[in-house]
Amino acid sequence: MKSHYNIWIAESYSCQNDIIQLLKNSNLSSHLTIFCSHSKQRPELKLHADYFFQQPVVKDSSDWLLEQCKEHSIHLLFCGKHSQFIEQFREEFSRHDIQLVTGARGISKHKNVNNKFLFGQICEGLNLPSISAAKVAHVNELKQAIDEYQQRYSVICAKPVYGVYGAGFVQLSDDVSYFMKFQSNTLCNTQQFIEAYAQLEPPIEYLIMPFLQGQECSVDIACSNGKILALVTRIKFKFYQECYIEHPCHEICKILVEHFQCDGLINIQFKQDDQGAWHILEINPRPAGGFSYTQHTGINLIAELIAEKLHLVLKRPVPTTVVQVLPIIQSIKNGL
């Protein structure tokens, strides 16, 4: 067994620096040299990684990443953004003894979680608590789905079939003014949404769904080959978050992680209905932007993942069952 490994953290969302710092703060640090890359200028990554490189945009980066990994003798490549573009080249990385971590094993699994309509159908087929949804791809289909769902549910919403959670999501209401869209990006007049959708060329596939008005939670999970290594649930409040190492959604997560062969640092979103029952919103096969809040429970999710993949021994503090975490924003001067 090797005692030192070169790992590469490819472009991720806002949490990429957190990933690097959490590895540096663990006892794994002495066993790792951390390379990282991003397509944009990210000076904070240069501060904390051992080596930083400017990479092509993710969808065009597979060849570049493979060549860099070969040149620098990389043992593990972690992809935290649009990783389906890299997953399709898993065999090429494997031929060079490079472990590839993309959030799920197999391009079909990525397709199943990235298509939110298909994902919901699969969850329903597994008898898991999903949310009813109508898929539309034309303004006439949109009108019909809105009419149907307004008759069935007191409040409805719309969100794209593809995309990052929250992007393009709106709650629809007949009773708000058109101007409300400029005051709240998540609340829109129903007719205004229909008119805006009619102008799309080509139309975007959307889902019309009931809007659940209960509490929402976000489960951050380190997993390997469809098995959970560690998980923490976060509940977000306006000025703080609460983190739990035990939560009712965890049993559902085990089923989802195994079925979709999740593999990496991922995030699963849930929301409660009026009766307090939890429903699955989606799986993100990537780390959530706020996953680092979970470190205050004593569970270091990214370290758990890397320790498992590289067969390293991770030293773990005694975890805290429930913690309240406050964000602190601080600025530093960076020398040019």
Language model segments and positions:
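Short, charged, surface-exposed secondary-structure boundary motifs
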Residues: L45-L47, S62-L65, S108-F117, G166-A167, ...
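ATP-binding N-terminal substructure of ATP-dependent carboxylate-amine bond-forming enzymes
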Residues: M1-R105
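Phosphate-binding site of ATP-dependent enzymes
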Residues: F182-L256, F260, K271-H279
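Active-site nucleotide/adenylate-binding loops and adjacent lid/helix of ATP-dependent enzymes
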Residues: H110-E205, N225
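Residue-level detector of structured alpha->beta connecting loops
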Residues: S73, D97, N127, Y153-S154, ...
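Residues that mark the start of a beta-strand
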Residues: H4-W8, V155, L207
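ATP-dependent carboxylate activation and anion-phosphoryl transfer catalytic cores
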Residues: H4, H72, F239-L336
